[in-house]
């Protein structure tokens, strides 16, 4: 395990969104490099002010693109860390293009219809508190008035 991922062990990511707080338990045991990168981006303020650019009720809410279009990222691609962790309500996964190793900074939070993503998209977190805030996010691709991440920070 890298020093960065070791530092993230046992931590959570707290998203302050325009709909309320969302606490995500980080899962470094199954995706150490993704947890390390998400932690690094959050600590740098990268996610602050970024919108939820794709929200599909019954499926997922996606964010992490600084352009708000679904086409942007941080510029650093990550090698996939697929696992048997089952996607369910509140599971947080890394968005990617057709290439499995194209995850960057965009991620999604599942509602209920995500089971088919298991083993195909890297899981790096699980919402522990605040799914009610996620469920209130404005729907659309993109939403007419998208909700945003006000701040993202690591907590113990």
Model-predicted segments: where are they?
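Cyclophilin-like peptidyl-prolyl cis-trans isomerases
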Residues: 1-156
């Amino acid at each position: 395990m890298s020093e960065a991922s070791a530092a993230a062990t046992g931590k959570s990511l707290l998203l302050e969104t325009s709909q309320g707080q969302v606490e995500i338990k980080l899962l470094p045991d199954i995706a150490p490099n993704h947890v390390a990168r998400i932690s690094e981006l959050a600590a740098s303020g990268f996610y602050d002010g970024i919108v939820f650019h794709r929200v599909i009720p019954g499926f997922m809410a996606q964010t992490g693109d600084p352009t708000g279009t679904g086409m942007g990222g941080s510029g650093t691609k990550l090698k996939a860390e697929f696992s048997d962790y089952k996607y369910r309500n509140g599971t947080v996964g890394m968005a990617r293009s057709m290439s499995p190793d194209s995850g960057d900074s965009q991620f999604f939070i599942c509602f209920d219809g995500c089971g088919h993503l298991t083993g195909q998209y890297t899981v790096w977190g699980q919402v522990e508190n605040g799914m009610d805030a996620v469920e209130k996010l404005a729907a659309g691709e993109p939403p007419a008035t998208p909700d945003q991440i006000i701040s993202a920070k690591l907590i113990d």
